[in-house]
């Protein structure tokens, strides 16, 4: 008891309320009663929280204990509020209106704001519904994501020409050598269907005509049948056209294309027959390019002989007379003089090799005698070709 008295305050004897057990004095009675519970062990203040068995002798201790229960609830509430805010936070975003093309429907949002992230999500989704959950927090529900692909309307050309074909050289040749053929009336006899006729940028070019024809060549067999129809005035123009076609072929050796047989529906066959022999020459001529092709093939063999070019064959003289009947043109041969045929320079594909070899073998059987031109004429022609003005220089 002496050690307890050493802890008493110095005015302990002057205080009116003293403890009966330890003689400690207090200024107030409730303080004395509270001190008495320490000796008896009484704990009248029990915790009111369900499931908590604790009790306390002092009321302030009970209040301090109750704060532990309330602080845990408040902490859980604060955590739940923080998680809700991190889901969708629309407090600082700018107001946004969606276009009809994005497929976004806004229901019951009012003055709530949508963040920019939701705009990008909504634009990449097919159907987006935004529901208002209060407190300016929106929930985005996406059903089926879809990707918007821009569609460019490209007009379809029924007969496109590959880009490897140089149209600049075609137009330049057509402008320098216009088509002035006397056989332009042949075009009126055939049906002209723009949907089925192959499209060519310029029909006056011998390069384009040579590429469209399946039996195209620089020098063809049928030129000898049209030499008498061309007339003397077309001799110089035919020379220039043949040299221009030769230059265009040499400057563009690999520019050629082929079309399927269905694209050449308006083509007709011209089948001239020679009475003096069994040889029949057939050549496919396009409707849109018949006049130009006939003009380009009227290179006279007499001029070729004077210039010293070509390989000549000995044949009976014939004279042609064209007659028009059901789109087939026959040639009646009449003996008039000596005529020579030039050598062929034919550029064919794999499917035409058999036909070319068959025709060459048949021609060699009918005329086995072949004479080559002298070397002087060849050298003279090379000099003339080199000295000629170039129309293709830039």
UniProtKB/Swiss-Prot annotation:
Chain intervals with Polar residues compositional bias: 249-259
Protein name: Transcription corepressor MIG3
Zinc fingers typed C2H2-type, residue spans: 17-39, 45-69
GO BP field: cellular response to UV; DNA damage response; negative regulation of transcription by RNA polymerase II; regulation of transcription by RNA polymerase II; response to ethanol
GO terms under cellular component: chromatin; cytoplasm; nucleus
InterPro entries, per database record: creA/MIG_C2H2-ZnF, Znf_C2H2_sf, Znf_C2H2_type
Biased composition (Low complexity): 234-248
Gene that encodes it: MIG3
Annotated SMART domains: ZnF_C2H2 (SM00355)
Induction: Down-regulated at low calcium levels.
Entry's Gene Ontology molecular function annotations: DNA-binding transcription repressor activity, RNA polymerase II-specific; RNA polymerase II cis-regulatory region sequence-specific DNA binding; sequence-specific DNA binding; zinc ion binding
UniProt KW keywords: Cytoplasm, DNA-binding, Metal-binding, Nucleus, Phosphoprotein, Repeat, Transcription, Transcription regulation, Zinc, Zinc-finger
């Amino acid at each position: 008891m002496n050690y307890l008295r050493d802890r008493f305050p110095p005015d302990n004897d002057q205080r009116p309320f003293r403890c009966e057990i330890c003689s400690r004095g207090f200024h107030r009675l409730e303080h004395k009663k509270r001190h008495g519970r320490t000796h008896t062990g009484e704990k009248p203040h029990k915790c009111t929280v369900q499931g908590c068995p604790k009790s306390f002798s002092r009321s302030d201790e009970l209040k301090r204990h109750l704060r532990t229960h309330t602080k845990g609830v408040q902490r859980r509430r604060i955590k739940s509020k923080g998680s809700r805010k991190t889901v969708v936070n629309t407090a600082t975003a700018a107001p946004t209106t969606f276009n009809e093309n994005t497929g976004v429907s806004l229901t019951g949002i009012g003055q709530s704001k949508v963040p920019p992230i939701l705009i990008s999500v909504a634009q990449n989704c097919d159907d987006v519904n935004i529901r208002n959950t209060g407190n300016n927090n929106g929930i985005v529900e996406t059903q089926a994501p879809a990707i918007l692909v821009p569609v460019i309307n490209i007009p379809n050309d029924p007969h496109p020409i590959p880009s490897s074909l140089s149209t600049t050289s075609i137009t330049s040749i057509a402008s320098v050598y216009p088509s002035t053929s006397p056989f332009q009336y042949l075009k009126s006899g055939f049906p002209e269907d723009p949907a089925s006729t192959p499209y060519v940028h310029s029909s006056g070019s011998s390069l384009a005509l040579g590429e469209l024809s399946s039996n195209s060549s620089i020098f063809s067999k049928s030129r000898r049948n049209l030499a008498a129809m061309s007339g003397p005035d077309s001799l110089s123009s035919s020379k220039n056209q043949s040299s221009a076609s030769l230059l265009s072929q040499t400057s563009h050796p690999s520019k050629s294309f082929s079309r399927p047989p269905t694209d050449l529906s308006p083509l007709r066959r011209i089948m001239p027959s020679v009475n003096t022999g069994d040889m029949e020459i057939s050549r496919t001529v396009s409707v849109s390019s018949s006049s130009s092709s006939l003009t380009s093939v009227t290179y006279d063999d007499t001029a070729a002989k004077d210039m010293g070019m070509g390989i000549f064959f000995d044949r009976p003289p014939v004279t042609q007379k064209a007659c028009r009947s059901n789109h087939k043109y026959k040639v009646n041969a009449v003996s008039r003089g000596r005529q020579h045929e030039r050598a062929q320079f034919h550029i064919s594909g794999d499917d035409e090799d058999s036909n070319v070899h068959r025709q060459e073998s048949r021609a060699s059987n009918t005329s086995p005698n072949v004479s080559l031109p002298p070397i002087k004429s060849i050298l003279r022609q090379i000099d003339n070709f080199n000295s000629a003005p170039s129309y293709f220089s830039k």
